[in-house]
């Protein structure tokens, strides 16, 4: 009976998501639903292959959480969970033999050799690049705080096209010692079915542009391409989600908004006060968003139109497959049945911060460490040291790539693959 259940669980895991490629990790958390799930399986134990330490660590847009919430009475206020911690590490994507990341400190997009960590090319923008690039059909899609979306060639790094949504008003203004555009691209770029989607702007009173461009040309050429200006709707910041018919956009210090994918028109906002922040995950008919509400840390589970279904207290990361929900807090990993909501296993952990599911292995990042657990029973399989808080995990083409808050990117793989190397930029 146990073997039968394991077999069924693995089958559900394999078919729960349509993968762009079993080996690649072409966008943040693998896909435009931000599942953080890949069918790739890494053979354990892993060994450090290379470690890249940049000249400058990340320069976050919001280094610390707000001091307090004005909407909560002084008697009820608690320490705030950071709602805008989307750029505290150099999150990476990886396709084939290449690794890509953007730098908020150097205003650049980088391409590294996946086997050695050596730089293949670098592209300079005029503002911080805060989100992981998206890779699609041999092209790199990224946005910058200079107010421009860029499409680059994956092989050479040469510019194919650029697009500035607020071009008629696109001036640079001071922000924490840097010059940024009021129309900064703070959504990442999501590419699907020949269209590139992103937002421009983060001041509600100035309005925010929602954009859908031809991914090949960077132009508004067909009916499904558009540019919509939304005034006083919110400050959209975080990684965009796509369903077949809708766009879901984290609201930063508010709850997510959702839009019609065909027209870009606003369809509504999730229930206010529940699950605010830059984290969002789409799984079947559920959206998980947070990691905070007005009472403290929580990930909110909601229907596709924002109707609240459940709250997951203190959870700061989640992975949801066909049958199981994996929840991470700073002190615990939990696996829960989606159907019965019964806890399958718990594991204590110190300073947990990120997860990725590769086959039947759950990788977990924490302070100065990355670990691997059996996803079925929670048994610890492997761990290794990393420099700093492991905030980003990518599994691609035989490697585990770890991004930390120091700016380091570390590649783990089979010890016999390539000699270990330290790369200093």
Protein language model regions, located:
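Aromatic (tryptophan-biased) beta-strands that constitute blades/sheets of beta-rich domains
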Residues: 23-93, 97-100, 108, 118-125, ...
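N-terminal secretory signal peptides that target proteins for export/translocation
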Residues: 1-5
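Repeat-blade elements of multi-bladed beta-propeller folds
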Residues: 25-29, 81-109, 123-150, 177-211, ...
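Bacterial N-terminal signal peptides
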Residues: 7-18
